[in-house]
Amino acid sequence: MNINPKHLAYLKSKTYTIAIVDGFILLCLALVANFYAGRFATFHAGNSVQDIVLSNIPVFDVSTIFIYGPIVMWVMLLIYCFNKPHKIPFILKSIAIFIIIRSAFVSLTHIGPFPDRLIMGSDSPDWIRLFTFGGDLFFSAHTGLPFLLALIFWKEKALRILFTATAIFFGIIVLMGHLHYSIDVLSAFFITYTIYNISKWMFKNDFTMFELK
């Protein structure tokens, strides 16, 4: 198998290796934080509130798209990153910071889920319960993470359009299933923009590497 010489140079670089390892460690810590924040928020969930969108639309069964839609997105991103490994450290760390900040938000206010909502059945894969818990509402990761990728790839028009459209689509999906309040979806765009800029500030070297052709 022929390996692109430029890719090989990155793989042999100690700086790159450290950046990748740091990114994976940070992402693992973020996922642990997400797990405990989600369980905490769900256990302490209070009353539900009215919502101008959810109160006026029926519940749709969007479980398949809700579960497997993000998997398709992550597989596409993974394939892309294999071809451009220098972009991986900044992407990893930005996603990790997103998850950590969202975990903090989830832990703060414990509004209960909307009473008339889609319930994941017993036929749902067990692993989904490691990432979503029912009370981890604010703000929507289904909306925020694709938009984060849109911001990261803003200079690449096709990816910018793809990930922005994905963020909007997933936002509509979680509202159709009454899985998030409308404020969870709308706020995700604004909070994610701030997270993206925090990532650029925190990981300047990784961002510089990301920008390389």
Locations of regions flagged by a protein language model:
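Aromatic-anchored segments of alpha-helical transmembrane domains
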Residues: L31-V32, I99-F105, A167-H178
